[in-house]
């Protein structure tokens, strides 16, 4: 795509060297639009499927009035939020009150710059893609803290403190799990990590993906990912029965929609990261000798992301909410020690004759 736009502006339109630069900028903008529009639509219909799945598990119907089978319900929700008044507490900090939602949303969008959907579908293919993801997603906690403090509400501030402590705690466990993947892959480039999962003793099959040899750390990662996104059963930061929606409590209308959008985009991002790091990314679960269904493609990437997202919804509909002290105990006394211990075990495993990743 980049070469096509550069040729269009440089040769066809006769802009020379300037055309190469213009073509590069235009191609980047087009790629951003191609990523963001489907992403926002996915968020809209993820809310629909979430309500349908939870309704099914609770023997309810779910949305079924707005449009056929309730398919227009996400757009009705969007219009409702857009036209609701954005109220602000009289004693709140006006500037920070509006900066908070933006700071929560911006990192969720920016992280998609390095997520590949196959070997070619990526906005920026950099060698420190994983490090970039960890760095950029950790910034979203500042938006939560700012929103909680700027609202000048005890419930908002308590929810912000809970969310920030939980996010920072589980980032450690999740990072330890991802370090194990980097150790066996030898790279922080997502394309290289996916390619490494097609090699080894069981190369070319579903058993060569990182979820199986790293299964204990895969479980640590999945639990940490749910806690990192503040989803049930780790949603004490916005526990309706305890602190009345946490740092969201003073937000309404479009400002609340930004927090809502950030949460679901982050959830989709985690599902993409799970697919790339543990589930083989765009690699097919079938042998390549099976023809089309055995060919690596973006289709398999989307299927794996959908499976992880369904797991998120199943978890929310199944498990009760943990207490805050239980969440902290699970993170610091269970998951983090397991993560660091497995790094040592994996290092010894890789230098032993039983190395599976040669």
Swiss-Prot record:
Keyword Membrane: yes
GO cellular component: plasma membrane
GO molecular function: NADH dehydrogenase activity; oxidoreductase activity, acting on NAD(P)H, quinone or similar compound as acceptor; quinone binding
Main localization category: membrane
Stretches that traverse the bilayer: 20-40, 95-115, 128-148, 168-188, 206-226, 253-273, 290-310, 334-354
Location in the cell: Cell inner membrane
GO BP annotation list: aerobic respiration
Protein's UniProt keywords contain Transmembrane helix: yes
Reaction it catalyzes: a quinone + NADH + 5 H(+)(in) = a quinol + NAD(+) + 4 H(+)(out)
Membrane association type: Multi-pass membrane protein
Family matches, as Pfam families: NADHdh
Broad enzyme group: translocase
Entry keywords, A to Z: Cell inner membrane, Cell membrane, Membrane, NAD, Quinone, Translocase, Transmembrane, Transmembrane helix, Ubiquinone
The protein's Enzyme Commission number: 7.1.1.-
Similarity section: Belongs to the complex I subunit 1 family.
Function field: NDH-1 shuttles electrons from NADH, via FMN and iron-sulfur (Fe-S) centers, to quinones in the respiratory chain. The immediate electron acceptor for the enzyme in this species is believed to be ubiquinone. Couples the redox reaction to proton translocation (for every two electrons transferred, four hydrogen ions are translocated across the cytoplasmic membrane), and thus conserves the redox energy in a proton gradient. This subunit may bind ubiquinone.
PANTHER family xrefs: NADH DEHYDROGENASE SUBUNIT 1 (PTHR11432), NADH-UBIQUINONE OXIDOREDUCTASE CHAIN 1 (PTHR11432:SF3)
NCBIfam families, per the entry: PRK06076.1-2
Assembly behavior: NDH-1 is composed of 14 different subunits. Subunits NuoA, H, J, K, L, M, N constitute the membrane sector of the complex.
Name of the protein in its database record: NADH-quinone oxidoreductase subunit H
Species: Neisseria meningitidis serogroup A / serotype 4A (strain DSM 15465 / Z2491)
